[in-house]
Regions:
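Short, Lys/Arg-enriched, disordered terminal segments
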Residues: 1-8, 242-247
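Short cysteine-rich loop/turn motifs with clustered Cys
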Residues: 37-63, 89-92
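Histidine-centered nuclease catalytic patch
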Residues: 55-87, 96-117
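Short, surface-exposed, charge-dense and proline/glycine-enriched linear segments
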Residues: 84-99, 127-140, 204-212, 231-234
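Conserved, surface-exposed functional patches that form binding/active-site neighborhoods
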Residues: 96, 100-181
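C-terminal, charged low-complexity interaction regions
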Residues: 146-247
Length: 247
């Protein structure tokens, strides 16, 4: 989970239209939020990921569901309120169900900074406080089959790839052409842990704080005078979304 920025409210969702949709929902319970002018900007906001688990959406069986942060049956007047709607994977949406976030608060990625409530260790989420604990439980963020195993598989693959690049840099100083190719590949691989990609909070945490490969790569590239502004920017971006352990 990473902090999200709410995009501008769709022009189509006027106060009049919002009242109309709320009344329709109250009358017949229809899915009034299933409008392309609502779902498209929500997906764009998260780069086609679940706002909670960061699982990829609209791929294979992981289709987007619209989560009402304040549950639609408990807070009917907010059924299409902009800022109450989040793109969600089925697992998170089903598990959260009718959880009352006002009675038992959970992290709202639109309003909260996840690192204030959660940290990651070995591809699993841990609580910093009660709100963090509620979040893990309400969303099943540590479900092994749905989330932990996929996160770890990707994380280990990225580390193995970076270790191969590090080994190539340590064997001997590459030719300028080979060096440029290696640096570009390192940048591309590190960017896979960034906010546009799946499981970015977990992967950035693993790369920066759990695996030694990032520190060794940085040291080697600095020694070769190849650690540049782009690599520094990538590292800072990963730091901004990582959820390191307070230990």
């Amino acid at each position: 989970m990473i902090k999200l920025e709410l995009p501008e409210k769709p022009a189509e969702l006027t106060p009049e239209k919002e009242r109309e949709l709320v009344e329709k929902f109250k009358a017949d319970g229809s899915a009034v939020w299933k409008k392309s002018y609502i779902t498209k900007p929500l997906l764009a906001m998260t780069n086609n990921k679940c706002a909670y688990s960061e699982q990829a959406l609209n791929q294979e069986s992981a289709y987007m569901e619209v989560d009402h942060f304040k549950h639609k049956n408990l807070y009917q007047d907010e059924v299409v309120r902009w800022g109450n709607l989040l793109p969600s994977c089925k697992k998170c949406n089903d598990t959260k169900s009718d959880w009352d976030v006002m009675a038992d608060p959970i992290v709202n990625p639109l309003a909260d900074q996840p690192r204030d409530f959660l940290y990651v260790k070995a591809f699993r989420f841990y609580m910093k406080n009660e709100k963090g604990q509620n979040t893990i439980r309400a969303l099943a963020l540590n479900d092994r089959d749905h989330f932990v195993n996929p996160r770890s598989e990707i994380g280990f693959r990225i580390v193995e790839t970076l270790e191969e690049y590090l080994e190539a840099l340590q064997e001997e100083e590459p030719t300028p052409r080979r060096m440029k190719s290696l640096v570009n590949r390192i940048k591309s691989t590190l960017s896979e842990c960034g906010p546009k990609h799946i499981y970015s909070a977990v992967l950035s945490t693993h790369i920066l704080y759990e695996s030694p490969v990032m520190r060794k790569l940085e040291e080697r590239l600095q020694a070769l005078d190849q650690w540049d502004e782009e690599l520094e920017a990538i590292r800072r971006e990963l730091e901004s979304i990582a959820l390191p352990s307070p230990d």
